[in-house]
Every structure is written in structure tokens, then in C-alpha cells.
Amino acid sequence: MAQEVRLRLSSTDHYKLEEVCERIKKVVEETGAQMSGPIPLPTKRLLVPTRKSPDGEGKATWDKWEMRIHKRLIDIKGDERTIRRLMRIHIPEEVHVEIIMK
């Protein structure tokens, strides 16, 4: 019996995110399941402006720090064996995975 699984991956490091997507793609191809994706979702940009001067006096100069959160969406239609193999994939700490069973 085929199950539908939606994986939502997010990370600040897009290289590691693509690495995990390739591992997932390889497992799905080996088991013969159907896969759609990875679909790139919009990148979220977090900006934090901070004053350079610690005492608040002097010229108002600012540092702007930015963090980007990259996201991918993968839909998989496969059997229980495929899902078990997906659970055993090594995923780095920087990559967050959300699994939704349909």
C-alpha cells in the first residue's frame, strides 16, 4: 500500500540542504517510489541592524547582519520500505526536516 509523505527541509547552509536532497533522491530511485521535487520555496532573509559604537556617542554607523533560511519541499509516494530507508538517512545538524504523512 502506497503512502504519501511530504518532507519540508530548511537550513541556513544551502550546500548541506542540497546534499540531503540528493541523498533522498537516491533512496527514492533505488526503491522505485514516485517523487516530486525538490521544489525550492522562497528564501527567508532575517536582517539585524546593530550600532557599531558601543557607547552610543559619535557618528551613527551601523552593521547589518543577515541570515538566510533556504527551504525545499519533496513529495514522495512510496511503500513502507521506502519510508524506513528515508528515516535512516544521516542528516546534518544544520538541516531541519519536517515530515507530514498524508
Swiss-Prot record:
Assembly and oligomerization: Part of the 30S ribosomal subunit.
Keywords (A to Z) from UniProt: Ribonucleoprotein, Ribosomal protein
Record region (Disordered): 34-59
Family recorded in the similarity comment: Belongs to the universal ribosomal protein uS10 family.
Top-level division of the source organism's lineage: Archaea
Role: Involved in the binding of tRNA to the ribosomes.
Gene Ontology, cellular component aspect: small ribosomal subunit
Example GO BP: translation
GO molecular function term, any single one: structural constituent of ribosome
Protein name listed in UniProt: Small ribosomal subunit protein uS10
NCBIfam families, sorted: uS10_euk_arch
